[in-house]
Amino acid sequence: MIGLVLVTHGGLAHEFQLALEHVVGPQNQLSTISIGPDDDMEKRRVDILNAVSKVNSGKGVILLTDMFGGTPSNLAISVMEAGTIEVVAGVNLPMLIKLASVRGDDDMELALKEAQESGRKYINVASQVLSGQ
């Protein structure tokens, strides 16, 4: 199973986990890291590395961050290893739900593709969708 680590500003990572588990049930191999404005960033980087080790069963780990270019994303990118530890910025609930359903069977490349597609698919302006635009 592909491991997941949510790395976000404030408590958003934990709230995403709660929302995901509300929809699809408890998740194994999932960890959260919250980055605060006064945190020691090297300590948080070590926390990310420890979380990656904890959730990694050999199929890889996806680090999901809230915003590309933000501190959580930059810290996640600093531990990235292409093909083994990947970073997806701009996490949303549809993306997490998709990953929960595919990470047990898909390889890393396919899971990343499906997560990105699902995340994009569910970003909509409701009035445009409802009017058929």
Regions found by a protein language model. Name each.
Residues 2-133:
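N-terminal loops that bind phosphate or other acidic moieties
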